[in-house]
């Protein structure tokens, strides 16, 4: 055990050094600090087998900052054999609020999640525990829409190593074009992390275009027992003009009367079957078939548990619903700037960003026969999922908005259609005065005029002191990021209770940082300046009406990042974890 007393073992001079040395003396495990984390075991003493398979690692969050392995290891040992624990550490010797624990098998990991989630580790301090995901997928934005999958795959293999596959989705409006982004799959998390570091904006361009790169939402893994009971199909790559009736007819052709109902959202749909056998048969028969001029992809919908890793990662949240019904669908949604004139969000289902809005449908047809569904301006994300015992159906994840049928306490959203009412078609844009533009629209127009590229919004989430989910958007402007790679993304200093408010606030903050005044901008700038004076002496916020220099821009964006980190560290037990923390830029 002498090696454990060397200066490089991560223990000398640390907090609770005596307790930690007693722990490794008792267990025989090694404890070494490297790359901002302290690793216990991996492998444990006497381990001669291969490392545990994927799915054996759990994420433990909401750790008290002064809690260390001497308290956490004995707790985990009661559940199963620990292969490895990795605790993230800061420069002050405290933990960063979370750790990863790998058990010897999946059953132990599953039991650990059940037993340790919401476990009171100290008086009033509850742990947040969920499955960890070994993310191997990157999101790459800014790709020319005319490029094909084979071209993108070839280009990514030229600039990065370990590329396994590229996922490209056709445009909802024009199937001959892509959506301007792709998902790149790598052979390992390490390969993906190294590629992400290499592809940071400003370092590499694709076809002469600046690109935006970030972690994609990890693919949700569902156990076989749960998937064996699924009888709902997810159908994507539909034409916008394809109707629910057409989809139902096509799937009923496999077995008449097998389909219970169909729900289509823009270019994807969920098809409900009365039994699983019919669903599987239809999936095998229709996957890849051309429907209404477009080849469709058909898969089983994936149930999402309320305690899944998705809830704890940086992008969780969104706009949800409260209707009591049979199913909850998690809808992948991305706002398409090419259709802003419609005044409404555009729905499709790429595996893009990480918000998970929900849409509920009743268990029986005709439930809404005398109701009008009116779009809800905002509602707590995943509320409906929690209300239904934590089960939803996942197509893919993305950001955007949900639709509420009922249950929003902010104001009534449903009204009866009364006799004599006339429903008049109209453009939603006409509902607002034409002279007033929201901050996201202003930011988009400015980026277009200056050829900066489309702003990329990244949704993040944190849990407030009252256990309320809060949201924050980070904004990356491709051209500015390529010119000043060290100062992106634009990170506002405050979180919002609603996703739409967070997006507007992020756009306002970005405009103010760029020196462009917005409605209420003076007050926001003054508030920011006050926060700066209190928390970060020496920082200065650029005048909102004066031209902004590169130095001011860098200083202001750095300030925003520091303020966000300060707020998160001091107030909110955040779960801004995108993947593993092995020192390769995963966070």
Curated annotation (Swiss-Prot):
Please provide one cellular component term from the Gene Ontology annotations of this protein: endoplasmic reticulum
Which GO molecular function annotation, any one, does this entry have?
A: single-stranded RNA binding
| Pfam families cross-referenced by the UniProt entry | DND1_DSRM, RRM_1
- Assign the protein's first listed, main location to one coarse class: nucleus
* PTM annotation (Phosphothreonine): residues: 491
Q: List the disulfide bonds.
A: none
**Which function does this protein serve?**
Essential component of the apolipoprotein B mRNA editing enzyme complex which is responsible for the postranscriptional editing of a CAA codon for Gln to a UAA codon for stop in APOB mRNA. Binds to APOB mRNA and is probably responsible for docking the catalytic subunit, APOBEC1, to the mRNA to allow it to deaminate its target cytosine. The complex also seems to protect the edited APOB mRNA from nonsense-mediated decay.
UniProt remark on domains: The RRM domains are necessary but not sufficient for binding to APOB mRNA. Additional residues in the pre-RRM and C-terminal regions are required for RNA-binding and for complementing APOBEC1 activity.
The name this protein carries in UniProt is APOBEC1 complementation factor
């Amino acid at each position: 055990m002498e090696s454990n007393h060397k200066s490089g073992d991560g223990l000398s001079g640390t907090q609770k050094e005596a307790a930690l040395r007693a722990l490794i003396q008792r267990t025989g495990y090694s404890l070494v600090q490297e790359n901002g984390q302290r690793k216990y075991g991996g492998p444990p003493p006497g381990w001669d087998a291969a490392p545990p398979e994927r799915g054996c690692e759990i994420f433990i969050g909401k750790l008290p900052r002064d809690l260390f392995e001497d308290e956490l290891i004995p707790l985990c040992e009661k559940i199963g054999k620990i292969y490895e624990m990795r605790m993230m550490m800061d420069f002050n010797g405290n933990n960063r609020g979370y750790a990863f624990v790998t058990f010897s098998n999946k059953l132990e990991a599953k039991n650990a999640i059940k037993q340790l989630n919401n476990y009171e580790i100290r008086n009033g301090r509850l742990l947040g525990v969920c499955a960890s995901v070994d993310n191997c997928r990157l999101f790459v934005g800014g790709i020319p829409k005319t490029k094909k999958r084979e071209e993108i795959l070839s280009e990514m293999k030229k600039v990065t190593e370990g590329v396994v596959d590229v996922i490209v989705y056709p445009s909802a409006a024009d199937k001959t074009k892509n959506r301007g982004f792709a998902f790149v799959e790598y052979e390992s998390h390490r390969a993906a992390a190294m590629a992400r570091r290499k592809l940071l904006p400003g370092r590499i361009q694709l076809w002469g275009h600046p690109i935006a790169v970030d972690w994609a939402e990890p693919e949700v893994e569902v156990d076989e027992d749960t998937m064996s009971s699924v009888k709902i199909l997810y159908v994507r790559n539909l034409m916008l003009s394809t109707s629910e009736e057409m989809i139902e007819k096509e799937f009923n052709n496999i077995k008449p009367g097998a389909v219970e109902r169909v729900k289509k959202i823009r270019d994807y749909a969920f098809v409900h079957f009365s039994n699983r056998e019919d669903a599987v048969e239809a999936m095998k028969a229709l996957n890849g078939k051309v429907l209404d001029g477009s080849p469709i992809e058909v898969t089983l919908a994936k149930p999402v548990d309320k305690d899944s890793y998705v809830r704890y990662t940086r992008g969780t949240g969104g706009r949800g619903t409260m209707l009591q019904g049979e199913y909850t669908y998690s809808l992948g949604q991305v706002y398409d700037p090419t259709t802003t004139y419609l005044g409404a969000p555009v729905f499709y289902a790429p595996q893009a960003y990480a918000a998970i809005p929900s849409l509920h449908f009743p268990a029986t047809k005709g439930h809404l026969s005398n109701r009008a569904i009116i779009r809800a301006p905002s509602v707590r994300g995943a509320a409906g999922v929690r209300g239904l015992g934590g089960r939803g159906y996942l197509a893919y994840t993305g950001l955007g908005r949900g639709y509420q049928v009922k249950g929003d306490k902010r104001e009534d959203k449903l009204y009866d259609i009364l006799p004599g009412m006339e429903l008049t078609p109209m453009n939603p844009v006409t509902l607002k005065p034409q002279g007033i533009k929201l901050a996201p629209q202003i930011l988009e127009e400015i980026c277009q005029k200056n050829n900066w590229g489309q702003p990329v919004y990244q949704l993040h989430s944190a849990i407030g002191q009252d256990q309320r989910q809060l949201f924050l958007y980070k904004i990356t402007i491709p051209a500015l990021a390529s010119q000043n790679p060290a100062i992106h993304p634009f990170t506002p200093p405050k979180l919002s209770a609603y996703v739409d408010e967070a997006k507007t606030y992020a756009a306002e903050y970005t405009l103010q940082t760029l020196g462009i005044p917005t409605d209420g901008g003076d007050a926001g700038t003054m508030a920011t300046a006050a926060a700066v004076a209190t928390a970060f002496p020496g920082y200065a916020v650029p005048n909102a009406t004066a031209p902004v220099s590169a130095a001011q821009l860098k200083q202001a964006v750095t300030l925003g990042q520091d303020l966000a980190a300060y707020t998160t560290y001091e107030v909110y037990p955040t779960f801004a974890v995108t993947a593993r923390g092995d020192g390769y830029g995963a966070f």
